[in-house]
Amino acid sequence: MNCREIIRKLLLNPAHNNAATRTAQGDNGDSNQRAYTRISRLAAFQSAQTQESTPKTNGTGRATTEGLTEAEVRWLVMESRALFMSQPMLVEIAAPVRICGDVHGQYTDLLRLFDLGGFPPDANYIFLGDYVDRGDQSLETICLLLAYKLSFPETFFLLRGNHECSSINRIYGFFDECKRRYSVRLWKQFTDTFNCMPVAGLVEGRILCMHGGLSPELTDLDQIRRILRPTDVPDSGLICDLLWSDPSTNMESNWSENDRGVSWTFSESVVKSFNKKFDLDLICRAHQVVDAGYEFFAARQLVTVFSAPNYCDEFDNAGAFMCVDENLMCSFVQIEPTRTLLRYFF
């Protein structure tokens, strides 16, 4: 088993190609988003590695283009666990890099994101968590991301979100998808891998990234580095806050109980004081739907990035990702919402 074959199957599956040659249409019927086609994904795959065009078999005689076997997914999950354990809890990331927010099983939109930002290794990425649940293609989404992580371990980074936790994804869709398409055993192995994922990233020492936000317990970045793994997400404390907390403008104090029932909300002054103390330019986090796909807070010292357009098929939000260049200048690329949401499976 190898990542080349898994990526090939995820990007070039004939069932994907038939659907992906269509162009997403906006509310006015005009094409308002680049088509994501078999040709673009074929070029992306070939730019990453050489792969013979003849389909291989998996030992049972079944062509691998039909989909990933449970053994292949299990291999991908276990290899990723070992890689996560070999890297720190606070990963150090070099610019340039694209920073992406929640994806939530919206696999088609993940391909749109790569179509706009460049498929690895043509661009470097850090994703801020919440790969599974809510969307109907969590398995495609997490498998492609893990395959890219294994293929490009020093330029492709995946942080843990609050949905990379068994108590959450047991309820919001990922457990049911694993059980229906593979097995409960595989879901448990995903859980073991999620428990080893890093929870924060630092871009060139100036941009701190996490899924949720700050914590009243965070007084030294070495606290993150010293977190032991594997670990579940506790109900309170540093890990919980990094994955669950939110900024808020409606604050009578610096910290207040979060309406989610978990963790805290924090004020603008908390962000400004934190950035000054640690000599940071920006905090980049995800975790909340924002209409434009990105939204600033605290005089542009914190930004929320959300990369799942038309979230849950219930919102008209755009998705977005942030591009950080070599000089740490930041810009944003939007993934426009569409009424025509394409879905295809491996």
Curated annotation (Swiss-Prot):
Please give the InterPro entries that the UniProt record associates with this protein.
Calcineurin-like_PHP_ApaH, Metallo-depent_PP-like, PP1_catalytic_subunit, Ser/Thr-sp_prot-phosphatase, STPPase_N
Residues that bind Mn(2+) 1:
102, 104, 130
Q: Which domain of life is it from?
A: Eukaryota
- Cofactor binding description: Binds 2 manganese ions per subunit.
Which coenzymes or cofactors are required?
A: Mn(2+)
Q: Where does Mn(2+) 2 bind?
A: 130, 162, 211, 287
Q: Active site located where?
A: 163
Task: Give me the Gene Ontology terms describing cellular component.
Answer: cytoplasm; nucleus
Does this entry carry the keyword Transmembrane?
Answer: no
CDD domains documented for this protein: MPP_PP1_PPKL (cd07414)
| Coiled-coil boundaries | none
Catalysed reaction, written as an equation: O-phospho-L-seryl-[protein] + H2O = L-seryl-[protein] + phosphate; O-phospho-L-threonyl-[protein] + H2O = L-threonyl-[protein] + phosphate
The broad enzyme category this protein falls into is hydrolase
What GO molecular function annotations does the UniProt record carry, in alphabetical order?
Answer: metal ion binding; protein serine/threonine phosphatase activity
The record's keywords, sorted A to Z, are: Hydrolase, Manganese, Metal-binding, Protein phosphatase
Which family is annotated?
Belongs to the PPP phosphatase family. PP-1 subfamily.
Q: What else is known?
A: Trypanosoma brucei contains two PP1 genes which are highly similar.
UniProt-recorded name of the protein = Serine/threonine-protein phosphatase PP1(5.9)
Q: Which taxonomic lineage is given here? A: Eukaryota, Discoba, Euglenozoa, Kinetoplastea, Metakinetoplastina
